[in-house]
Amino acid sequence: MDQNANQKKRFFKDELESSIETTLTDKSSFLFEPQVDAIQEENANDPEEQIAQGTQESPFIEQLRAVLPTIRLEVALALEEKYRDIDDGLDLAISEYFDQYQTGNDDAPPSSLELQHSQEVLTVPDNEEKDTDLQLVSVKRKREDDFMQSSQSKKPQRANSSWKKFVGSLQVTVMVTRPTMRPVPYGTPLIFKRSNNNVPLKKIYEQLNKKKTGLAAFVKIYSANDEREIGRVPEDIARIVFPLLHRNEVHFKLTMIYPGDKRLSIGDNIIIQMDSFLTSTLFNRKENPTFSTQNGNGRERFGAIVETEQELEERNIRMGLIMLFDKIKLRPVKDEAKFLEKLKQDGDDNEIVDLEDDESFGNFLSQEPLNDELPTQHQEDTMNINQLTSFYKATQSSKQLNSLIPTTPPPELVKVELRKYQKQGLTWMLRREGISIGHDNEDKSEDDTTLLNPLWRQFQWPRNMSWHNQSTGSENDNSNPKLIFFYGNLHTGEFSLERPTMNSFKNGGILSDEMGLGKTISALSLVLMRPKDEHTTSQSLFHQESSNLSSDDVIEIKEPERSYAYKTTLIIVPMSLLTQWRDEFDKVNNNAGLTCELYYGGNVSSLKSLLIKRKNPPTVVLTTYGIVQNEWTKLSKDGTNIRSLGRTSGIFSIEFFRIILDEGHTIRNKSTITSKAVLELSSKYRWILTGTPIINRLDDLYSLVKFLKLEPWSQIGYWKQFITNPFEERNFKQAFDVVNAIMEPVLLRRTKQMKDTDGNPLVQLPPKEIVIEKLQLSKKQKLIYEEFLQRAEKTFRSGLQSGDLLKKYSTILVHILRLRQVCCDSNLIGTLDENDEDLSSGNNKLITESVDVKTLIPDTEEEEDEVPPFENDELDKLIESVEAKFIDSNQLIPVECSICTAEPIESSSAVVTECEHVFCKECLEEYGNFQKEKSLQQKCPNCRRDINLNRCLAFEKGSDGILKLIHFDRKERPAKLNALIRHLQQLQDSSAGEQVVVFSQFSSYLDILESQLNEVYSSNKLKVYKFDGRLSLKERTAVLEDFKVKDYAVQKVLLLSLKAGGVGLNLTCASYAFMMDPWWSPSMEDQAIDRIHRIGQTNSVKVIRFVIDGSIEEKMLRIQDRKRTLGEAMDTDEDERRKRRIEEIQMLFES
């Protein structure tokens, strides 16, 4: 007993020390009899007991136990007897152990996972009697046998496959784990085996995620002939193979390639060829009840969603297929026609991918995908507007556009002549409503019933390059040799041999032509070509005989949910465009029987009566987003149910024949009342007109998709799963692939740069010149600017040093806003910028905080001139003399400025010196400043007498229209105002009656400009119009109509807010524009300029942008240039947008 006590223990648990009780007696031994009949027989002749009583283990057995600590003693003795006298006997013994005694997995060396499982099963309390140890071993074996049987019974049966088809080959390096007594020849067939089937799948992947184990431990290579283990594959291959071995959906054929002429030892590397085949089982999953292609939601556990075992398996099968396709370079086909043409020219040239050829494989990975191919792997890049180019290109390929045969509307319907691309667009729009144009060679490629479902990818069956086919020249895959393509949905794991097409959608779309290409004319042409539903008549709606209807039909007609206005198209537009659309309708329509009605301002008491009860209802009803929103809000407050909308009389009581949304991106934010209201409107056909379907976020498209009722994408769950979530996870390519596939059939976009079939631009526009004019701040502006700049830099540096720049975000933006305002006019300080989302909420008190500009100017500032102004009697005497000399019949007599020689001088800009000589104000001030810089006394240019600008007179027209003289107030005008006045004067001199548009993002600045221009110019020389969001519809209409009328005697200037001017206005009557201040986004300014430079413009367009030299405006231009080069960022969320804005702010404060 003492000897036993000193013997080295072989187990970590005391209770296991005497638990191995088996016998080794000829045919009753474990080698020949797997089932032990009686524990008592084991105890009687237990070799373990014999060793415990005094026999020492041999060195061979000790070495064997060191490698295989759980090997049974009788097995170890038998292996010792067989191999102890042979060279490499230990390696051969280990190999035979795994070949012969591991088949039932009873004695296999447990992985870390099995050890944990075994320890749990074998753990017993310390106070258990020792005679239970023997029972424990037998019980443990029985449990393992039962577990194996039950797990085998639970596994789904491997479905029989009727055929398999080759998809690709890999050459894989395998590490040898078992030695061989003889070489494994070249061409020897090998097989995969999944070991440790008794370990739960979930536990395997949990350990894999924790990086405690790899799947390579569970995937082994065996000889196909004698099922002898050879080695293990690399981890990346194991991750592909492990989930796919469980089912007969993917078949692998393995062949020994190298070395083939020598015995293998543990640790050697060999090369095998892995040929991959897809089987018929993969394409018949719907017939296999054990597999679900639906994305389950898992089971709920304590309120959380837990992935089921089956869902885990299906997910990893999908991942295995994706990784396999990547490895074998099986890429989706993007353009089937182009691919087939290329295939015909080049033939099929598949290759075997050698994963060990680092150089060739590295070159493959670095290759750019072909134009007709898309890599399966998701590429993550910075998301910007440049990536939107691919989105737009998907809808504007030359092949697609050129295939559209022009449709010319009859002249009795459409008064104007459409351009060729507009006629092609009309063809496309009619097709989108399911109307056959009747062309003999009509291209049916646009039919979305043949378009591939966007969740699916098309793959080509490659030529069979398997080892068996290359060696025998026989395919032998029992598949249809005529098959060229197969289709896979890598999101759900479904595969099909038939093309999965989209559900037929023929009820509208998105016309997304670039601004200025005439979307309005195109839409109205569609309305005039097809003004009503041809398949519906008033008689069929209201006077059908009940005998011809089923009972269900009669009930449906008796109580309709909404009345069908089958002759009316509803067009919803921004308020500023309401009258413009009405004018365009009158301009285009040549059929007196088709009319247009405005639905605005309560002019229609009952829209339902107008559209349903009248024999000839209006063809078009024009209304605004505001009217739709107001009606919806009222119905919501009244508690009106959607089902009972038919009982109301407004816009929601009707199902329209067609609804058209102009500037459709207005509904992009699905949470706004406007968007919710528009989505509740009812119609048979739905159209969206927008030049910018995406503005800030990819989700901008969702409301458009929901309005168009594109199923299943209009369901928020689908949209989030396949677009929003990948986008937020920065899988931009995946999100855009799906979006492109969704939008391609329903969106048409043309740009001004595109060319027609003859190589000419779609539209010939006159040239456009944009000039940046840099100005210097006035002295007063400069003092104020420097003060605000110091404050802004102090706040920025403080936030940068403390690391809380985002916390000071709003404060910094206010400082920047004030700097921009000072560059325009210091009187702007304290007003809002309605275009800035971060400052337009009105919650920021810093914006509206009053600032006394006078306190910012140093007290030490000396008066420019110490000469006192006039005394009262002096002023009166001078006024009396000048009036008699220069005013006749309430007009300033013609007089020439001797400085600039301009004649006559405008009374509003004339200044009279004390010596009674008249000059232009700008000329005299410039002359005075020059004299002062030279430290010379200011003298009259005419008589050379000493003069002082503080002692001069100016002309002013009172409210009664009488011209009078007043003391000249020599306050300094802001730099931009002076520059604008100078350019307007030059235009008056060179181009009489020229109409001018002045843009600014500050509505308050427009007020200042209006006041200042009216002070400088008389009404008979210059007329100022102002157009911003504060005007009513009537006022807007009057402003635009009056401005568009050319008057050669009066110069017309339209002051336009950037926000109002960026939407739909047609201002081709003007050819000059001035941008008074820059904005962060260059696209917003481009939209405004396109109001002038668009179809209908006959003159060259010149745009002058005023920028203060060396100011924050100059740096804003650099940000604009950067955005034009790199693309404007699209943000995933609010935080992302703020971070990008902070980057821009940092650029502003860079030296």
Curated annotation (Swiss-Prot):
Signal peptide: none annotated. Residues 35-54, 142-161 are annotated as: Disordered. A motif (DEGH box) lies at residues 662-665. GO terms for biological process: double-strand break repair; error-free postreplication DNA repair; error-free translesion synthesis; error-prone translesion synthesis; free ubiquitin chain polymerization; protein polyubiquitination. GO terms for molecular function: ATP binding; four-way junction DNA binding; four-way junction helicase activity; hydrolase activity, acting on acid anhydrides, in phosphorus-containing anhydrides; Y-form DNA binding; zinc ion binding. Residues 39-49 have a biased composition (Acidic residues). SMART domains: DEXDc, HELICc, HIRAN, RING. Residues 979-1146 form the Helicase C-terminal domain. A zinc finger (RING-type) spans 897-944. Residues 500-711 form the Helicase ATP-binding domain. Probable helicase, member of the UBC2/RAD6 epistasis group. Functions with DNA repair protein RAD18 in error-free postreplication DNA repair. Involved in the maintenance of wild-type rates of instability of simple repetitive sequences such as poly(GT) repeats. Seems to be involved in maintaining a balance which acts in favor of error-prone non-homologous joining during DNA double-strand breaks repairs. This is DNA repair protein RAD5. It comes from Candida glabrata (strain ATCC 2001 / BCRC 20586 / JCM 3761 / NBRC 0622 / NRRL Y-65 / CBS 138) (Yeast). The lineage of its organism: Eukaryota, Fungi, Dikarya, Ascomycota, Saccharomycotina.
